Amino acid sequence: MSDISPQDQARILSEALPHMQQYDEETIVIKYGGHAMGEEHLAREFARDIVLLEQTAINPVVVHGGGPQIATMLGRLGIKSEFAAGLRITDASAIEIVEMVLAGSINKQIVSHINAAGGKAVGLSGKDGNMVTAVKATRTMIDPDSNIEKVIDLGFVGEPDKVDLALLNQLIGHELIPVLAPLAVSTDGQTYNVNADTFAGAVAGALRAKRLLLLTDVAGVLDKSKKLIPELSIKDARRLIADGTISGGMIPKVETCIYALEAGVEGVVILDGKTPHAVLLELFTNQGTGTLIYK
């Protein structure tokens, strides 16, 4: 804010007050990923913004991805990355690397950034305290040669089955900031890699969060002329999926939004994590940013 006059700084803070009051003591789940996580200056800005939320009596819960970092590490080790239905096929050798990168390197880096900014973050995965239990994910696709539907074996890729809030509520109650890697465990102890958007949606739904923010590399949901759609109801979102306006990788993100809303989240926003202070712009300004999806 160095280029802003003191008077404008005061006005901005004053205008943010009703928004801060709206979110007082509420839980906000933020899915953090994409290029915003890979660029150091954006990563540090994000950490400061998370600390600011906590300092204004908001309970932030961070869920992070790590696809590019996983791909880089697998490549270094000579393990080929394969995808099906938008999900990384994760075999026995890959799941160890995925866990190392997500729960080790990335998670602890985010925790360090938040703590350096004055927060008290705790890094965990869904395995800790059996927080998130998962079942094996299944997908089908049509074989182009035979035109027969086939089941795809995704390996150790899971979908959330149950979220136990005991540990999360303890952390939030002690004013700690949970930073969660999207790993889960099955009832027989098997580790599963879970899509970060899906993981965040499950956690937000279980917490009945005030907001779920999905930080991406795009401005939000776009119409057919590539213009941002500021707001969508669930009904509108389903219609845009059906007519092809929402397509490709945006479909599972919007489906996660719908799931979270139906599970009790008040509002979900898809926004561009590359925008400086995107989280603050969404929560503390009248205009907001990205696409708000609501019931």
From Swiss-Prot:
EC number: 2.7.2.8
GO cellular component terms listed in the entry, alphabetical order: cytoplasm
Site (Transition state stabilizer) location in chain: K31, K253
GO biological process, one term: L-arginine biosynthetic process
Pathway assigned to this chain's UniProt record: Amino-acid biosynthesis; L-arginine biosynthesis; N(2)-acetyl-L-ornithine from L-glutamate: step 2/4
Location(s), subcellular: Cytoplasm
Coiled coil feature spans: none
Keyword presence, Metal-binding: no
GO molecular function list: acetylglutamate kinase activity; ATP binding
Family annotation (SUPFAM superfamilies): Carbamate kinase-like
Residues binding substrate, per UniProt: G66, G67, R88, N193
Catalysed reactions listed for this entry: N-acetyl-L-glutamate + ATP = N-acetyl-L-glutamyl 5-phosphate + ADP
Entry keywords, A to Z: Amino-acid biosynthesis, Arginine biosynthesis, ATP-binding, Cytoplasm, Kinase, Nucleotide-binding, Transferase
Superkingdom classification of source: Bacteria
Disulphide connectivity of cysteines: none
Function, in words: Catalyzes the ATP-dependent phosphorylation of N-acetyl-L-glutamate.
This protein's name: Acetylglutamate kinase
Source species of the chain: Afipia carboxidovorans (strain ATCC 49405 / DSM 1227 / KCTC 32145 / OM5)
